[in-house]
Amino acid sequence: MKLDNLSPIKKGKVRDLYQLGENILIVSSDRISAFDVNSVTEIDGKGRSLNSLSAWWFKKTGNVFPNHFLEVLNSSKMLVKKAERIDVEWVMRGYLYGSMHRDYAKGNRELYGYKLPNGLNLAEKLPEVMLTPTTKADVGHDMPLTKKQAIDSRLVTQEEWRILEEASFKLYA
């Protein structure tokens, strides 16, 4: 499928979206974005891998929570139903790692509304599985969110939070 006559309706960090009739075409690129930083370097084949992995997970989890996936069109393109994006990243954690470990190492013991005990080490299993949501920033850093912040800032309603929190824990399990 050629995109010569189409302009993206949105250019993301690694994916571009195009209106295709009533649906959306998602094109996964070879661009690199890690830890909220976009690189000028690309990785050949990354878009194909990302597209394939995303399609696999959409198919695998669609019975737990409905999603927008329709079909893979080719190695880097998929067709999805048009949907409204919720600007929250629903990050589940079972282990102390990444940005949570960084904040914990700085002495922060209350993160994302959870109180963590002293003495945890990098990659150690957390006392419980934790939902650690962040903003979904188009540019720059995603910021940690609590349930109250997400609802107060109207990123989600209380009912949307309940449904998505429940689905996140089901998907993690």
Residue ranges and their predicted role:
Residues 1-136:
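Active-site loop/lid in soluble adenylation, ligation, and acyl-transfer enzymes
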Residues 126-156:
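A short mid-domain helix/strand-loop element embedded in enzyme catalytic domains
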Residues 153-173:
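A long amphipathic alpha-helix within ATP-dependent nucleotide-binding catalytic cores
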